[in-house]
């Protein structure tokens, strides 16, 4: 990784991660608008195909050399990246965006919990859990939530956890350029699946520009930024900071879909933001991960 990335201030990866999450939320809103045209698998195919082309053109990954011990994590990174996209888009066909994001977040939350070493880290995880608990419709509306969609969102969360863990080891040497190889692996698996299910509509001229925008907002930009953050932040800090995702999804729904938030939901968002801020304020520069400890 270039020396400039290695010497970046401790707060900069946090800002980079927040920008990546905001980009993903914008891309998710746009992607859902394409579902009536090509379906969730088709949007996944567009996102990965076009996003991979952008990443390959920018990073020129054929010049990279990966050590033998990095190849298996790289494979897991690519497969989990594709699985996370595919399962999440399938889930939001039948589950509201905010609920799907909250359920998907169980993956990075588990990473934060199991990577915790200090009592103060556990406090931030508990705050994030409380926020997620009150964001989910656990009262009368839960019976109206599609269980299959919820299961798909949880599956996306599991892929997200693998993405975090494998991404740190796979990207330790080449940083954000690694995402181009990971995206290529994901595309080789999931683009054919999506193309078969979407049919000829996938490549219609009116769909391609929107698909390109989704690819930039949801793949090329955020995953490149996340790879920088992954290799510069402790596992627990990265996982807890991702608690901003459900909050951003809820705010996005309020702005673009006209959804209103109850006082309890506002408190839940406050708890999640507090967890993210607490994790940020207690991050220690010397604790940045150089090699992932999986024990």
Swiss-Prot record:
Membrane topology listed for this record: Multi-pass membrane protein
Record field: transmembrane: 10-30, 39-59, 72-92, 94-114, 119-139, 147-167, 176-196, 201-221, 238-258, 263-283
GO annotation, cellular component aspect: plasma membrane
Periplasmic face of the membrane: 31-38, 93, 140-146, 197-200, 259-262
The keyword Membrane appears for this protein: yes
EamA domain sequence ranges: 30-135, 159-278
Alphabetical GO biological process terms: homoserine transport; threonine transport
GO molecular function, one term: homoserine transmembrane transporter activity
Subcellular location, record wording: Cell inner membrane
Keywords: Amino-acid transport, Cell inner membrane, Cell membrane, Membrane, Repeat, Transmembrane, Transmembrane helix, Transport
InterPro entries recorded: AA-Vitamin_Transporters, EamA_dom
UniProt keyword annotation of Nucleotide-binding present: no
Cited Pfam families: EamA (PF00892)
Cytoplasmic topological domain: 1-9, 60-71, 115-118, 168-175, 222-237, 284-295
Main location: membrane
Role noted for this protein: Involved in the efflux of threonine and homoserine. Can also export other amino acids such as proline, serine, histidine and cysteine.
Family label: Belongs to the drug/metabolite transporter (DMT) superfamily. 10 TMS drug/metabolite exporter (DME) (TC 2.A.7.3) family.
Full protein name: Threonine/homoserine exporter RhtA
Organism annotation: Escherichia coli (strain K12)
Gene name, Swiss-Prot/TrEMBL: rhtA
């Amino acid at each position: 990784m270039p020396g400039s990335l290695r010497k970046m201030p401790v707060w900069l990866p946090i800002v980079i991660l927040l920008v990546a999450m905001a980009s993903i939320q914008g891309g998710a809103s746009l992607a859902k608008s394409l579902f009536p045209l090509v379906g969730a698998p088709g949007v996944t195919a567009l996102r990965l195909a076009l996003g991979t082309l952008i990443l390959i053109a920018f990073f020129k990954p054929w010049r990279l050399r990966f050590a033998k011990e990095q190849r298996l994590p790289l494979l897991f990174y690519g497969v989990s990246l594709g699985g996370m996209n595919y399962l999440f888009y399938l889930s939001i066909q039948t589950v509201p965006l905010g609920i799907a994001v909250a359920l998907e977040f169980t993956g990075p939350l588990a990473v934060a919990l199991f990577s915790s070493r200090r009592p103060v880290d556990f406090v931030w995880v508990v705050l994030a859990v409380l926020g997620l608990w009150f964001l989910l419709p656990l009262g009368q509306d839960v019976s109206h939530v599609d269980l299959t969609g919820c299961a798909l969102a949880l599956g996306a969360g599991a892929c997200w956890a693998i993405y975090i863990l494998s991404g740190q080891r796979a990207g330790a040497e080449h940083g954000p350029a690694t995402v181009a190889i990971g995206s290529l692996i994901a595309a080789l698996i999931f683009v054919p699946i999506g193309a078969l299910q979407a049919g000829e509509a996938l490549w219609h001229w009116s769909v391609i520009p929107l698909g390109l925008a989704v690819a930039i907002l949801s793949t090329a930009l955020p995953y490149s930024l996340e790879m920088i953050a992954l290799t510069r932040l402790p596992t627990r800090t990265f996982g807890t900071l991702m608690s901003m995702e459900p909050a951003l999804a809820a705010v996005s729904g309020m702005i673009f879909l006209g959804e209103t938030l109850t006082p309890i939901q506002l408190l839940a968002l406050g708890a999640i933001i507090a967890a993210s801020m607490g994790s940020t304020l207690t991050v220690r520069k010397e604790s940045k991960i150089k090699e992932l400890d999986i024990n």
